[in-house]
Each structure stands twice: as C-alpha cells, then as structure tokens.
Amino acid sequence: MPELPEVETVRRGLEKLLLGRTILSLEVKVPKMIKTSYDSFLHDLPGQTIQAMRRRGKYLIFDFGQLIIISHLRMEGKYLLFTDQVPDNKHFHLFFKLDDGSTLVYQDVRKFGTFDLLDRKQEEAYFTRKELGPEPTKKTFKYVPFERALMHSGKSIKPLLLEQKLVAGLGNIYVDEVLWAAKVHPETPANKLSKAAMKRVHDQTIAILQLGIAKGGSTIRTYRNALGEDGTMQNYLQVYGKTGQPCPRCASMIVKIKLGGRGTHLCPHCQKR
C-alpha cells in the first residue's frame, strides 16, 4: 500500500501534470469505487478545472475550488497520464478526458481504491470522521499530545501507530523503520514505553517519513510515481524486507514476525521488549 511518502510523491507529480487542466468528460468502469453519489460524480465534474493538488495523510485531494475529489489509492492504485490514445488494459477503471487532449487514467489491480466528491466545506468534517491524526511535521505533530496518548493506551505500539489517529501516514514499511530507528520493539504496549523511547518514536516518525518523501517513496512491488518513475527509498530501508540479513546497527540477524496480521521486521537485539 502506498504510504505517505509515496502519496506525496504522486501528488507532486500530478501537480506538475494537471494544474490548470479542465475535465471535459469522464468514464467510470467500476462504480463501486465512487463512495459518494455516482450520478453527481458523472455530472458535476465535467467543466471543473484542477486548481490545486493536495494531500492529507494517505489521501490525495483534487481541488477544483468549490468541489474536491478525495482519492485513496489503497493497495495498488496509481494514476497514469496519456497524451494520445489510451491502451487497452483491464485494470484501467476511471478515465478523465482533459482539455489539452490528454487522459488521466486511474489503474487499480485490486479495485480497492476509493473516490469521494465533496463540497470543499465538507473536507474538515470528512477527515474528522476518519479520526485522522496530524501530519508528520515538526510544525503539526506535537510531542506532548502524542506522549499523552501513548501513556493512556495499552495497545502494542506498532498497531497503534498504524491506526492513523496519533499521526497520519505511517504504513507497514515506514512503521517498521521508525521503530527500528527508535530501538523500540513493535509489540511493546505503548504505555510501557519510557518517555525517552516515546520521544524517539515521535522524532523518528518525522525524520523517516520526510526522508521517504525526499527519496521519492519506496518501490517495493508495483509503486511508481505519476511520471512512471521508481522511488529510491527502498535503497535506504534498514529492516523492512531484510529478514535474515545483519542489522546495520549491531549485526544481529533481522527477523520477521506476525503482529496484528502484518509481517513485522525487527532486530531482536536492538529492539528488546
């Protein structure tokens, strides 16, 4: 699943390609992906001009001024822009014909992606309902509320971080990297962490997600940015996908366990419970 760095990289690519473009027509082959009114999606979007490409957590936001589309890529979603004829592909599900003759296509092998067409005034309430935490920046992700939330939760730290309520954007790849960098075992109950460990988790969340953005995201399986390019963050991962390899910090073997149904990578020496 694309995590925050991948979605931000897609956003930046789409921004370069789409700002100022007007939707002339659209086709939806998988109506279940449209989570708001299907008829409104078909009838209200033609004539709308893309004024901004924004992001909130793992959600992409196409901003038309009064209207917005909130798009979630889920497991395998990606956007492709074709300047002339669109090739046949059974995994192409949404087609946006643009005023310069190009076509923006949404591709999704799993068909899990979602689209919500909303009035911009509904955006804040939408993300409030999702209980989405702050963006992982020094300005928005404050330590004191984070510490307070950890102290009041007995959940294992990894599943807790993946809920998106404490901070937006972490997924399976980056949470493993954050906890390794913070020397915290993923199964540790949040309220059992020392305050020093809580601070390390907080600071490494910001640092590693920002590094992921700088490196254009991680291309592990199928991820590409909006320009069709691979990310490079996979070259900087320390534990994710490194089972049986030496820990970069202590040379112990990286192991993989199951936690909350997810494969979880850690160093048993550096990340003691």
UniProtKB/Swiss-Prot annotation:
Active site residues according to the UniProt entry: P2, E3, K58, R262
Keyword Zinc carried by entry: yes
Record keyword Hydrolase present: yes
Known EC number: 3.2.2.23, 4.2.99.18
Cofactor, free-text remark: Binds 1 zinc ion per subunit.
The entry's keywords: DNA damage, DNA repair, DNA-binding, Glycosidase, Hydrolase, Lyase, Metal-binding, Multifunctional enzyme, Zinc, Zinc-finger
Catalytic activity: Hydrolysis of DNA containing ring-opened 7-methylguanine residues, releasing 2,6-diamino-4-hydroxy-5-(N-methyl)formamidopyrimidine; 2'-deoxyribonucleotide-(2'-deoxyribose 5'-phosphate)-2'-deoxyribonucleotide-DNA = a 3'-end 2'-deoxyribonucleotide-(2,3-dehydro-2,3-deoxyribose 5'-phosphate)-DNA + a 5'-end 5'-phospho-2'-deoxyribonucleoside-DNA + H(+)
One GO-annotated biological process of the protein: base-excision repair
Record's signal peptide: none
CDD domains in the cross-refs: EcFpg-like_N
GO molecular function terms noted in the UniProt entry: 8-oxo-7,8-dihydroguanine DNA N-glycosylase activity; class I DNA-(apurinic or apyrimidinic site) endonuclease activity; damaged DNA binding; zinc ion binding
Family: Belongs to the FPG family.
NCBIfam families per UniProt: fpg, PRK01103.1
Subunit and partners: Monomer.
Physiological role: Involved in base excision repair of DNA damaged by oxidation or by mutagenic agents. Acts as a DNA glycosylase that recognizes and removes damaged bases. Has a preference for oxidized purines, such as 7,8-dihydro-8-oxoguanine (8-oxoG). Has AP (apurinic/apyrimidinic) lyase activity and introduces nicks in the DNA strand. Cleaves the DNA backbone by beta-delta elimination to generate a single-strand break at the site of the removed base with both 3'- and 5'-phosphates.
Identification of the protein by name: Formamidopyrimidine-DNA glycosylase
